[in-house]
UniProtKB/Swiss-Prot annotation:
Cell division inhibitor that blocks the formation of polar Z ring septums. Rapidly oscillates between the poles of the cell to destabilize FtsZ filaments that have formed before they mature into polar Z rings. Prevents FtsZ polymerization. Keywords: Cell cycle, Cell division, Septation. It comes from Neisseria meningitidis serogroup B (strain ATCC BAA-335 / MC58). The keyword Cell cycle applies. InterPro entries: CAP/MinC_C, MinC, MinC_C_sf, MinC_N, Septum_form_inhib_MinC_C. This is Probable septum site-determining protein MinC. The gene is minC. One of its GO terms (biological process) is regulation of cell septum assembly. Belongs to the MinC family. Interacts with MinD and FtsZ.
Length: 237
């Protein structure tokens, strides 16, 4: 008899404090010399996780990623993912079982723009990150302390995160996590609802099956009511 365990685990949004290594050379011998000295500090602390920032390199072929990951690992520095502003690096990250992170500053410059609004007294209000290009599988976009607006399609396996609201004016097939810092008033607005997972302030729902016809591939809004996620068609009473 096969037994299924329900609620065996929960999926929640989280933020990890992970150090970033900005790589300036592809020379493994030069890196080895530095790591022999620096690595002792990390070896004493056990394995320390890092994201490898490869922004200074245009193409994955310019680096021996397998050797780099192995080199850092030998010195107590575990590479969890790659960071770059160009999506071509996502495939390289997947090849070596690494996460891929879009460089936030470069991502904003290449894909969209940031608008910082001001209140009447001149104080900075919530800023808005605008992404006009498609967000592809493996990419993550994070709007810190503000709202996120996306006008391009969001692929399955892509992730949108905002401390405020999320607006998606295109088909949404990935994950959307609003109110990432706990804002329970945050909302998610989707033009064509096909998401894998949605979350508001850590309360999530994943979708293993299509929603009812009045919601699937329709404009919807997602919000919290009484600590529960509510998904409703936009324009419905």
């Amino acid at each position: 008899m096969m037994v299924y365990i329900m609620n065996a685990f929960d999926i929640k949004s989280t933020k990890m404090d992970v150090l970033s290594i900005s790589l300036h050379t592809s020379d493994l011998f030069d890196l080895e010399d530095v790591l022999v000295k620096l690595g002792k500090k990390f070896q004493e602390s056990g394995v320390v996780p890092f994201v490898l920032d490869v922004q200074e390199f245009d193409y994955p072929e310019s680096l021996d990623l397998a050797a780099l990951v192995s080199l850092f690992s030998r010195h107590g520095m575990q590479i969890l993912g790659l960071k770059h502003s160009n999506e071509r690096w996502a495939a390289a990250a997947m090849k070596y079982h690494l996460l891929f992170c879009l460089s936030h500053s470069e991502n904003v410059k290449e894909l969209g723009q940031v608008e910082v609004q001001k209140t009447e007294d001149g104080q900075k209000a919530r800023k808005t990150v605008l992404i006009t290009s498609p967000v592809r599988t493996g990419q993550q976009v994070y709007a810190e302390d503000g709202d996120l607006i996306v006008t391009g399609a969001v692929s399955q396996g892509a992730e949108l995160i905002a401390d405020g609201n999320i607006h998606i004016y295109a088909p949404m097939r990935g994950r959307a996590l609003a109110g990432a810092k706990g804002d329970t008033s945050a909302r998610i607005f989707i033009h064509s609802m096909q998401a894998e997972l949605v979350s508001v302030a850590g309360i999530y729902r994943n979708f293993e099956q299509d929603l009812p016809n009045h919601l699937h591939k329709q404009p919807v809004q997602i919000l919290l009511q009484d600590n529960r996620l509510v998904i409703s068609a936009i324009g419905s009473e």
